[in-house]
Regions:
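Residues in well-ordered beta-strands of folded domains
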Residues: 36, 223, 240
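PLP-dependent aminotransferase class I/II
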Residues: 235-248
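N-terminal "arm"/small-domain region of PLP-dependent enzymes with the aminotransferase-like
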Residues: 1-71, 76, 83, 244-247
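Conserved core of the PLP fold type I
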Residues: 59, 64-200, 210-231, 237
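Short, histidine-centered active-site or binding-site loop motifs used for metal coordination
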Residues: 39, 173-177, 243
Length: 248
């Protein structure tokens, strides 16, 4: 009887062990207070509100709640998300411009799948989110690290790297960078958008932490600022998340 060895796709040669998953395994141990994983405090979950909303959805529209839906997401939800984003300054994002994904990680995977070919240059902050590195490398990206300081990515250096490498995209976490915690200044945010237009380069703005702040609100997102820089909106992919403020 002939035995066939299982042959995986070549792209899986780029897959590395997830450091984040290894860290999360520690959370199951008693007495652990983890500063490593981005878990929201479970005591803050609105369990009663989520239970009530789930029961109402099943009572009022059971077929719609349990049936297949549109790929881009449930339309009333996208309408609510459009209003939510408008309240945060991104006032002209129509529901039809939104896609609902299973976490922003799926959005990043879709961007990698649709935008990155093997060998493409992709600029990321140094350091940046580990899961994004793994995701983009899976699709064969050649990652280029852009230096940062307390005000986020250094835009002079970013321009130099864009001009030199002509990347397929630039991935940034402007608000409370992970793992740096850096906050991209308002001046640099505008400059990033100007660079996108100047070099016709896609900017991916990952914004899972924009609602988590004490005291003064952070600067507007790149998405909210984009109307001030003509031509930049079409070169911007914004990834938001409810995982930190509602529940994962």
């Amino acid at each position: 009887r002939h035995q066939h060895a299982m042959q995986f796709a070549d792209r899986l040669n780029n897959v590395e062990t997830s450091a984040i998953r290894e860290l999360f395994k520690l959370l199951g141990k008693p007495g652990i207070i983890s500063f490593a994983g981005g878990f929201p405090d479970s005591a803050m979950f609105d369990v009663d509100g989520i239970r009530e909303a789930s029961q109402r959805a099943l009572a009022e529209e059971p077929g719609g709640a349990l049936q297949y839906g549109a790929t881009e997401g449930y339309e009333p939800l996208r309408e609510q998300l459009s209003a939510f984003m408008a309240a945060k300054g991104a006032k002209d994002v129509a529901p039809g411009q939104l896609i609902v994904t299973t976490g922003s990680q799926q959005a990043l995977d879709l961007l990698g799948k649709t935008m990155i070919s093997p060998g493409d240059k992709v600029i990321v902050e140094g350091p940046t989110f580990l899961a994004t590195i793994q995701c983009f490398r899976l699709y064969g990206a050649d990652l280029v690290s852009a230096p940062i300081d307390g005000q986020g990515v250094k835009t002079d250096e970013l321009e130099r790297l864009i001009a030199e490498h002509r990347p397929k995209l630039v991935y940034l976490i402007p608000t409370f960078g992970n793992p740096s915690g850096a906050m991209l200044s308002l001046e640099r945010r505008r400059r990033v958008l100007e660079l996108a237009v100047k070099y016709q380069t896609l900017i991916v703005e990952d914004d899972p932490y924009g609602d988590l702040y004490f005291g003064e609100a952070p600067p507007p997102s790149l998405l909210a600022l984009s109307p001030q820089v003509p031509g930049s909106r079409d070169l911007l992919a914004h990834c938001g998340s409810l995982s930190k403020v509602l529940s994962p």
